[in-house]
């Protein structure tokens, strides 16, 4: 569901299809278009209807904090991310290219130019 957002969705589709994720699966399937799944639509609409100043998403793969999307790095994003990293012991990191499109954080950064983070809270 995380690869359902309109922020580089076509790039995500190309990458994930080349990796063999061409049909519904537990991870890495982008769907047939952005925002086709009800859960993604609900999160999208919920976000549009509120005035968030910062956004956090949680995943469970890696003890890292992702803070950018392509060239989108809103003011103070890095310093806020470093505070999260210091408090959590996680690494503030750039997103690997093959995972850097169509996520909720990506869309939030692109749409609002406000700080947004994906916190990878578990182990790989």
Model-derived regions: residue spans:
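Active-site/substrate-binding loop(s) of hydrolase catalytic cores
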Residues: 1-75, 118-122
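Catalytic cores of processing enzymes, dominated by hydrolases/peptidases
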Residues: 64-124
